[in-house]
Amino acid sequence: MAKNEKQFVEEITKMEDDFPQWYTDVITKTDLVDYAPVKGFMVVKPYGYALWEKMQEFMDKKFKETGHKNCYFPLLIPESLLNKEAEHVEGFAPEVAWVTHGGNKKLEERLCVRPTSETIICTMYAKWLKSYRELPYLYNQWCSVVRWEKSTRPFLRTSEFLWQEGHTLHETAEEAQEETIQQLEVYKALCEELLAMPVVAGQKSESEKFAGGERTYTIEAMMHDGKALQSGTSHFLGQHFTKAFDITFADREGNLANPYHTSWGASTRLIGGLIMTHSDNRGLVLPPRVAPIQVVIVPIAAKKGNVMETVDKIYADLKAKGVAVEVDDRDNYTTGWKFNEWEMKGVPVRVEIGPKDIENNQAMVFRRDTLEKDSMPLEGLADAICDLFDVIHNDMFEKARKHREDNTSIVENMDEFRKALEEKPGFIKTMWCGDAECEAKIKEETGATIRCLPFEQENLGHKCVYCGKEADSMVVMAKAY
């Protein structure tokens, strides 16, 4: 490796030396994001936005398959609307950004820049809904929201972020509950089928649930450093908002009733999760299904023989199969530089083709996830690479799943709890009595929170990890982003 090529890679801090700096190096040096002039805001650059577009495409297809429609609601919400649901405003008030002037004129009422849209959407639903025949309302919007965060990190926690938020109304509580779980399953599929990111699905504790909701469900992923990342949430809101906003409909008996309400969302923090699940000290490692560029072809000695003719054929064959492929035929960079750059950008597959390869009717195929290189026959190469995508996805998923399992501890008491956090940072499975005071004490003493009560419960005993009282709920706890 030439000196400048080696330096190119060494510009990324090693994650074992300084994990936060490693993350910052990866997201900036791979051109995903840049810092905006306003603290806590980010510019998502084309390569980073392409990742979000892939996620959008996956979710949008799933939403529409179940009858959901996209729409758009205003950015600004009158303060009086925000105040209508007491728990909700209390939960979001510290993070709200306020508009107080229109031009040079002070507004009669402050307007908040949406931190989430329940209040404005419910206001409109109250205006529109008349009869049970119109239900369910199945609406989703793609937008940005603003939450004035004190401590920020691009993608993971920013004052403005991109997301989708679904808001639905239903005739019965059972239908609303079914909707809530259905959308959580969409997020689970997004993480596991597109991002190769294993997640634990479950219900949030009362103290961790959405402000103004009855029940919140979540998917939690483990990052390289053992911390949890909440990767998508779905809320059963009951009738809290529909009563507060006087949303009524004529039911089947002709009586006025309040519908049942859900909301659910996933955001660009998933990009941060993707990076911290798979990437390494050389840069990004992207699963093929979400990678903006799935294959890069690097010609070797491009001007010799029929190298470029062969490259063009491989390119055309891959394009015909819907593969996102690029040819790097820049003549002002060395081959080594090109290899390092594409590895840093996380392109899943690199195809190298030169005169000797053509003589042998083969190409060299490099996998970014394993850093392994093998020869493949030119005949049927495009099909072989498409098959390889599935192998890479499954291998990456399994590697992340094993990392989670290897860094999950089972504990029975607080001594074991503290020891596990110190010796093997990661998830902790334990029993909890359901008392919010025990939950708060654990957080205060260790910094770990209940990430969820998993749907897949395990019997780990009958005593609460903190107080020793009778317990019948297994929880997953961790420090979290």
From Swiss-Prot:
Superkingdom of source: Bacteria
Protein name, UniProt field: Proline--tRNA ligase 2
Family membership noted in the UniProt record: Belongs to the class-II aminoacyl-tRNA synthetase family. ProS type 3 subfamily.
UniProt cross-references to Pfam families, sorted A to Z: HGTP_anticodon, ProRS-C_1, tRNA-synt_2b
One MF annotation (Gene Ontology) recorded for this entry: catalytic activity, acting on a protein
Domain comment in the entry: Consists of three domains: the N-terminal catalytic domain, the anticodon-binding domain and the C-terminal extension.
Gene3D superfamilies for this protein: Anticodon-binding domain, Bira Bifunctional Protein, Domain 2, C-terminal domain of ProRS
Catalysed reactions, semicolon-separated: tRNA(Pro) + L-proline + ATP = L-prolyl-tRNA(Pro) + AMP + diphosphate
A GO cellular component annotation in the UniProt record: aminoacyl-tRNA synthetase multienzyme complex
Compartments, record wording: Cytoplasm
GO biological process, one term: prolyl-tRNA aminoacylation
Source species: Clostridioides difficile (strain 630)
Entry keywords, A to Z: Aminoacyl-tRNA synthetase, ATP-binding, Cytoplasm, Ligase, Nucleotide-binding, Protein biosynthesis
EC number(s) per entry: 6.1.1.15
Class in the EC hierarchy, top level: ligase
InterPro entries: aa-tRNA-synt_IIb, aa-tRNA-synth_II, aa-tRNA-synth_II/BPL/LPL, Anticodon-bd, Anticodon-bd_dom_sf, Pro-tRNA-ligase_IIa, Pro-tRNA-ligase_IIa_arc-type, Pro-tRNA_ligase_II_C
Subunit details: Homodimer.
Annotated function: Catalyzes the attachment of proline to tRNA(Pro) in a two-step reaction: proline is first activated by ATP to form Pro-AMP and then transferred to the acceptor end of tRNA(Pro).
